[in-house]
Amino acid sequence: LDASKCADCGACKNACPANAIAAVGKDLSIDTGKCIFCGDCATVCKMNAITFSQEYRLANMTREKLIVRSGEIYEPERPTNREFLRFCSKSLKIRQISAGGCAACELDFNVLGTLAWDMGRFGIQVVASPRHADCILVTGPVSRNMLLALKKGYDAAPHPVWVIACGACAISGGLYQDSEETMGGIEEILKPDLYV
């Protein structure tokens, strides 16, 4: 985000389907916890104040770190929590719970087990039951119909269990954040330990 190039026209904010852009004058910020990375904001910005990089490390331990402000260079957060580092140092058993999503994040997660990415080589394995899981990876905006299933899945896991919010929908509700049929993400239900 380059505030010096911003014409303060509001086109980027109006083009954003996820309401991820905040603008106070020429000071811009993008909430990557809401952003679906469609690129519409960059396309409509005639001044090129918004551009997307090739940075793929988008995970953070806190929700606030997902907000990128003009003039800041995005730097991925390094995990410093000793318990988290110890937790991830051996093997990791993940139970993925789809809480009413469109399947986009589920597909992205599933591809991590293929030959090209092979998360198993790092000791990461998807398990069929939350009873065998070290962490719960949640995708989707948490529809009202999936709320009970999500809570039961979390409760069934041996504690302490880590919670990963994967994708804009799980983090903030994404495109469905204003829907009465969703909970607007998992933060009000389960506190995520990691945001992806």
Model-derived regions: residue spans:
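Conserved beta-strand scaffold positions in the cores of enzyme catalytic domains, especially
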Residues: 1, 94-96, 163, 195
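Cofactor-cradling patches in redox/metallo enzymes
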Residues: 107-109, 114-117, 121-196
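Iron-sulfur cluster-binding cysteine motifs and their immediate structural context
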Residues: 10-59
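General structural feature for long, well-ordered alpha-helical segments within catalytic domains
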Residues: 8, 12, 76, 80, ...
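Structural motif
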Residues: 4, 33, 139-141
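Extended, small-residue-rich solenoid/repeat segments and analogous flexible loops
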Residues: 1-8
